[in-house]
UniProtKB/Swiss-Prot annotation:
Family: Belongs to the EMP24/GP25L family.
Full protein name: Transmembrane emp24 domain-containing protein 2
Membrane topology listed for this record: Single-pass type I membrane protein
Segments forming domain GOLD: 30-112
Lineage: Eukaryota, Metazoa, Chordata, Craniata, Vertebrata
Organism, as annotated: Rattus norvegicus (Rat)
Length: 201
């Protein structure tokens, strides 16, 4: 019989396979991250550009044989899942080479699934329904975590847009007030001079 402590340790181990990061990528720079996996392992990349420029980044996933698995240009966010076609180190790169001066902040998560099991272990796993339920729960919790991180980044982006719009509206209002005061003073001065009585000596 599996104890509650063993279940919690198994759940924590399953959740530990997904790591979320924030990375700053300078203009004309590229940042790469590497994961070593066995053939058949399911992998996934979820990313979102949080700050910088037009919120776009170039993304590339390369296999151990330097074969391109995925390439995206000027993407703001994305999700890509694939199965490793061979044993080795897979490379996940974010490139900001198209930007002339703006650094980008990218939030990303690389999900690494479980390595495929042998035939004997697979039948044993089917017999253990509790382990399957824990795996499903771990996947669901990871999905909720990713969605929460995504919403947090979107909220930060929208707050920055709102703050920027608010500051522009306030500055424009001050400018309009100054123009209104200047026009009022000009009209008072003009009317005052218009009604002045000029004396001829």
């Amino acid at each position: 019989m599996v104890t509650l402590a063993e279940l919690l340790v198994l759940l924590a181990a399953l959740l530990a396979t997904a790591s979320g990061y924030f990375v700053s990528i300078d203009a004309h720079a590229e940042e790469c991250f590497f994961e070593r996996v066995t053939s058949g392992t399911k992998m996934g990349l979820i990313f979102e550009v949080a700050e910088g420029g037009f919120l776009d980044i170039d993304v590339e996933i390369t296999g151990p044989d330097n074969k391109g698995i995925y390439k995206g240009d000027r993407e703001s966010s994305g999700k890509y899942t694939f199965a490793a076609h061979m044993d080795g180190t897979y490379k996940f790169c974010f490139s900001n080479r198209m930007s002339t001066m703006t650094p980008k902040i990218v939030m990303f998560t690389i999900d690494i699934g479980e390595a495929p099991k042998g035939q004997d272990m697979e039948t044993e796993a089917h017999q253990n329904k509790l382990e399957e339920m824990i795996n499903e729960l771990a996947v669901a919790m990871t999905a909720v975590k990713h969605e929460q991180e995504y919403m947090e980044v979107r909220e930060r982006i929208h707050r920055a847009i709102n703050d920027n719009t608010n500051s522009r509206v306030v500055l424009w209002s001050f400018f309009e007030a100054l123009v209104l005061v200047a026009m009022t003073l000009g009209q008072i001065y003009y009317l005052k001079r218009f009604f002045e009585v000029r004396r001829v000596v």
